[in-house]
Amino acid sequence: MSKIKESSSGILGASNNTNKESSQKSARSIALPMTYALIGVSCLNVWNSALGLNIKITYNIFQMAGLLTSSVLALFVNYPRVLLPTSLGVLTLLCAGFQIAHQTFSDSAFDTYCLAAFITIGLMAGIAQTIAFAIGTTKESNMSGYISAGIGMSGVLIFCINLILDYIVSDEKIYEINKSKLLCLFSISEIFLIITIVCCVLYIDLFPKNDNNKDSTDIEKAEEKEGRLPLIEIIKDGYKAILSIFLVNWLSLQLFPGIGHKKWQEKHGMTDNNVTIIVGMFQVFDFISRYPPNFTHIKIFKYFTFSLNTLLIGNFLRLLFIPWFVLNAVISSSFFTNIVQQCVCIAALAFTNGWFNTVPFIVFVKELKKVKHQKDIETISRIMVVSLFFGLFFGMLTTCLYDYFPIGILNN
């Protein structure tokens, strides 16, 4: 009898262990995508908070320089994974710095802090995103789409909070920046950053060389005997994804907000309320469009991912947004000045922006023909991040080209 009891207890024990393992795997399968989404949210929250508060808006170019610098360096320096939570920690300190400097520094000292902070934000956010995309794309279940989704989520989150704060906080300003809104927005950013740091420590293997078995979902490394490819061969194999990510970001930042809404407002005298609606439309539709490509296992969303060839065709078709945006600026007929039509225009640009930003990171690994080594895949991911930031940078630069064209007003 005792043997039977021991045997049955052994079976029950094994069953309990199996249940525990399955529940742990289930929890991890939820926590890991959430962690990568939080990385996307947290990296953008600080920048979006500064934009929402209109803090030294001209300093955005310095943040972009920081993003480009950190992403280009990643091509030559292999950032250790531990820099992921470290860079997020620095962003947390910068948020606290904004709160302290705004209330205690002189105008010139605050201006100096903002300049240094924007450069550092660019560097730290660039490092965090580069590392996260490099790790995420080499997962068996590609996690890079969740980072992209988090990036879109940040814009909507900060925009909505900003609108709510307009109705519930005082109008007191220091250096033309609302004191209460600055405290609230950066406090929210700090909370997200702290949660993200904890999740990174818990769910991402930050020291893979010290534990070969810890992260079983990583794609197996190629045999060491199988040498890595030269950089030119890596670029040849991944150029479609690299070009796609550049084109989508270049066009989006060239047209928004430089042409629509700024040129529209300048030419037609749009109300501030309509401008807020248009900005909100971009944030919302950019956010919405980043999710369907991550859920293609659901039948209704299966057409939201496609080949990189199709994506390139889609990016060239997006060039049709240029005449549409320009016509909205130059023609004063009731159709082109109608807020509904303008919202449709912005929503279409935003939807394709979020959608076409997410697809390349999800599908490029499957379309690689020569590249098989994990480190080579990470290299392509880093180059794609560089291409993304270069697209944003050149989009900002080429917006000013429209100032050299005689965009007048054509009446009915």
Swiss-Prot record:
Catalytic activity line of the entry: inosine(in) = inosine(out); adenosine(in) = adenosine(out); hypoxanthine(out) = hypoxanthine(in); guanosine(in) = guanosine(out)
SUPFAM superfamilies the UniProt entry points to: MFS general substrate transporter
Biased composition (Polar residues): 7-21
GO cellular component, one term: plasma membrane
Protein topology in the membrane: Multi-pass membrane protein
One function term, GO molecular function aspect: nucleoside transmembrane transporter activity
Cytoplasmic side: 1-29, 78-81, 136-144, 203-240, 295-310, 365-382
Region ranges (Disordered): 1-21
Main location: membrane
Subcellular location: Cell membrane
Record's keyword terms, sorted: Cell membrane, Membrane, Transmembrane, Transmembrane helix, Transport
TM region positions: 30-50, 57-77, 82-102, 115-135, 145-165, 182-202, 241-261, 272-294, 311-331, 344-364, 383-403
Extracellular side: 51-56, 103-114, 166-181, 262-271, 332-343, 404-412
Entry function: Nucleoside and nucleobase transporter with a broad substrate specificity.
Family classification: Belongs to the SLC29A/ENT transporter (TC 2.A.57) family.
Protein name (record): Nucleoside transporter 1
Source organism (scientific name): Plasmodium berghei (strain Anka)
